[in-house]
């Protein structure tokens, strides 16, 4: 096997605030990207738990996090990628615009493939305005079934929560220790 480190491919190449997109190399960490975007009143919505994870790693695993309920996983927030195929060919996949309906979406196949199909060298990501205010709730449920039922009703209610996170007794005990 081959181990490839993209840690030095860590540049934020450009940010288009009007188009609400950012072009990054795969070694940029989620924390670095979020700090950069916060200064511009923007944010990248996928929010997996590990803030030192790289954007390339998030793309390779199609990471999501609690915000995936409303904002989607990494796959839903990548406009385009540049990648190197095993043959050495460099390909540009996806579109540089938010709506793109032409042909097969090979980029979607690449995202989540864990590096088995290509090496990602650049990603153009969708951005959103930074959140001005937030509110959180912790709701206890007697059973998994009642929790899932409430989540389904919430999803169909017309309300639009950005984050839903399920924690069972073991996870609560672990996070409390």
PLM region spans:
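Terminal amphipathic helices with adjacent charged low-complexity linkers/tails
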Residues: 162-177
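FAD-binding subdomain of flavoenzyme oxidoreductases
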Residues: 11-165
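Glycine-rich loop at the start of a catalytic domain that most often binds anionic cofactors/ligands
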Residues: 1-4
């Amino acid at each position: 096997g081959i181990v490839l480190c993209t840690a030095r491919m860590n540049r934020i190449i450009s940010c288009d605030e009007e188009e609400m997109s950012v072009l990054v190399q795969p070694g940029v960490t989620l924390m670095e990207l979020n700090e950069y975007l916060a200064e511009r009143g923007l944010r990248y919505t996928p929010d997996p738990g590990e803030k030192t994870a790289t954007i390339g790693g998030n793309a390779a695993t199609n990471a999501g996090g609690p915000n995936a309920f409303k904002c989607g996983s990494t796959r839903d927030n990548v406009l385009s990628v540049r990648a190197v195929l095993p043959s050495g060919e460099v390909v540009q996949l996806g579109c540089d615009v938010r709506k793109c309906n032409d042909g097969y979406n090979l980029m979607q196949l690449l995202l989540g493939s864990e590096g088995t199909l290509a090496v990602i060298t650049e990603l153009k990501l969708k951005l959103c305005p930074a959140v001005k205010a937030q509110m959180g709730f912790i709701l206890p449920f007697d059973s998994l079934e009642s929790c899932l039922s409430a989540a389904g009703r919430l999803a169909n209610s017309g309300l639009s929560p950005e984050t839903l996170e399920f924690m069972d007794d073991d996870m609560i005990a672990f996070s409390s220790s």
